[in-house]
Amino acid sequence: LANRVFADEGFLDAAREFALKVASKAPFSMQLAKEQLNLSAERTLDACLTAELEGMMFVGTTKDWQEGVDAFAEKRAPIFKGE
């Protein structure tokens, strides 16, 4: 699955910028998104939606989720710790 195309010129800078953006996200959320994507070809839509809901319910119990809410309310960048 590809979601970006970069020109040869500036490729490394663009790829690095994209990687840093992904790395700044909450680890549990990114891990669950990757797992969902990898398993989606083997599941029905209903099974995918159920698993996504379960993942969202789990993520909502983490310290990183609260950090995201707090950071949004305080208009600052979140600092995720994988907790």
Short names for language-model regions:
Residues 64-65, 71:
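Interdomain hinge/lid region at the active-site interface
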Residues 27, 68-69:
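Helix-centric, low-specificity signal for extended rod-like, repetitive segments
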Residues 70-83:
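Terminal low-complexity tails and localization/encapsulation signals of metabolic enzymes
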